[in-house]
Amino acid sequence: MNLFPPNMKSIRILTVLVLSALSGAVARAHDKSAELDAGQKAFLAQYEKVRVALAADDLTAAKSAAAPLAKDLAEVAKEQTKAQSAADAAKKLTAATSLAEARGAFKAVSKRAVHYAQGQKGYYVANCPMVEGGEGDWVQTSTKISNPYFGKSMLTCGSIKE
């Protein structure tokens, strides 16, 4: 005994097909690694060097790694005004005289990194709830937390958001 008339069965099949197609599109939208251009990939690679240095409490290495970021972001900011705050922050990071100052500037640079990395394969957005203002997001290439905001004193504080 068929509970649905033939045309209802066709509608159900069509609905299942449409939903299947949509779920595949959503999954592909989350994995948009092919959409990163060479400049964005270079930015994220250099950003990772800054993050690792800050997690290790190495101000000299963080400042050194931030210099190419500052230069590249200044160029991007000429065409994209949204990049200006990250460019200014990267420049401040290169001139930082303390880890606290460098980490403060790193927050603004991290906003740009999160923008690029969200949904990208191989990049993880992490968060430390202890960062003032709840703005403790950063990007890393490993699922093992390595906190750049508190370094060695709270190296594993945080969690992967996405």
Regions found by a protein language model. Give the residues of each.
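Bacterial N-terminal signal peptides that target proteins for export
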Residues: 2-18
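Intrinsically disordered, low-complexity terminal tails/loops enriched in metal-binding residues
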Residues: 20-23, 27-162
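Generic N-terminal simple sequence motifs
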Residues: 1-2, 125
